[in-house]
């Protein structure tokens, strides 16, 4: 049986910086206020994968937000390589062929604890963006259909905006993860996110993990900012 998540376990700090050195300095400043970090494209291509391996070896959880999407064989082999780094979470786009390939890749690595997350609709998108991209329906419909596909294929969890978390939970059930980006403490600027929610509201909506970037990484005191968000999670 999985142990209950502590408030600190629920916070994932987004390391959206340009170099490994910069990321490591931030991790040092945050200290024990967080123990879960997200590495995406920018840092991933600038020493982030080596950093992910080091952090995982030291017991820190790592979320590789690489949003893989390619032909099946390429995704399968890429996930095999990433699973060996020791990361805890990895994102793939919620297309059936991509998700099945990711599962094959992960399952082929003995002892891998990697959990796969399907990206439904990016939190920078709204209904107008989907119409521009050629989709007939809106965000809510596309999120629900992609979440159902991920559930049926056996993906471990879903990445979605907290505004969709309750609806996604109804689709995927209680045992799969929901990870929500676009989290901003009360009063913080929304930046380039269009569907933002406070930490407490996201937890109440059913999210398991919250991804927070600039409110922590650009704070004068990142450790205090992380602790404040953990406190808000605890009070939800």
Swiss-Prot record:
Pathway: Pyrimidine metabolism; UMP biosynthesis via de novo pathway; UMP from orotate: step 2/2. GO terms for cellular component: cytosol. SMART domains: OMPdecase. It catalyses: orotidine 5'-phosphate + H(+) = UMP + CO2. Keywords: Decarboxylase, Lyase, Pyrimidine biosynthesis. Its EC number is 4.1.1.23. Pfam families: OMPdecase (PF00215). The keyword Transferase does not apply. GO terms for biological process: 'de novo' pyrimidine nucleobase biosynthetic process; 'de novo' UMP biosynthetic process. InterPro entries: Aldolase_TIM (IPR013785), OMPdecase (IPR014732), OMPdecase_AS (IPR018089), OMPdecase_bac (IPR047596), OMPdeCOase_dom (IPR001754), RibuloseP-bd_barrel (IPR011060). The active site is at residue 67. GO terms for molecular function: orotidine-5'-phosphate decarboxylase activity. Substrate binds at residues 16, 38, 65-74, 123, 184, 193, 213-214. Coiled coil: none annotated. Catalyzes the decarboxylation of orotidine 5'-monophosphate (OMP) to uridine 5'-monophosphate (UMP). Belongs to the OMP decarboxylase family. Type 1 subfamily. Homodimer. This is Orotidine 5'-phosphate decarboxylase. It comes from Methylobacterium sp. (strain 4-46). The lineage of its organism: Bacteria, Pseudomonadati, Pseudomonadota, Alphaproteobacteria, Hyphomicrobiales.
């Amino acid at each position: 049986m999985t142990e209950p998540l502590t408030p600190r376990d629920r916070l994932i700090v987004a390391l959206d910086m340009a170099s490994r050195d910069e990321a490591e300095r931030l991790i040092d400043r945050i200290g024990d206020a967080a123990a879960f970090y997200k590495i995406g494209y920018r840092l991933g291509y600038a020493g982030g994968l080596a950093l992910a391996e080091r952090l995982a070896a030291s017991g820190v959880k790592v979320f590789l937000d690489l949003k893989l999407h390619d032909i099946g064989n390429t995704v399968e082999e890429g996930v095999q390589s990433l699973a060996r780094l020791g990361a805890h979470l990895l994102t793939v786009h919620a297309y059936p062929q991509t998700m099945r390939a990711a599962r094959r890749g992960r399952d082929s690595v003995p002892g891998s604890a990697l959990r796969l997350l399907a990206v439904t609709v990016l939190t920078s998108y709204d209904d107008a963006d989907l119409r521009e991209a050629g989709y007939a329906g809106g965000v809510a419909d596309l999120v629900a259909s992609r979440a159902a596909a991920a559930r049926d294929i056996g993906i471990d969890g879903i990445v979605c905006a907290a505004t969709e978390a309750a609806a996604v939970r109804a689709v995927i059930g209680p045992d799969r993860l929901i990870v929500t980006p676009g989290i901003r403490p009360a009063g913080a600027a929304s930046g380039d996110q269009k569907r933002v929610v406070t930490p407490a509201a996201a937890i109440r909506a059913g999210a398991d993990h919250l991804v927070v970037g600039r409110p922590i990484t650009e704070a004068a005191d990142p450790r205090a900012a992380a602790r404040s968000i953990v406190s808000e999670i605890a009070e939800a």
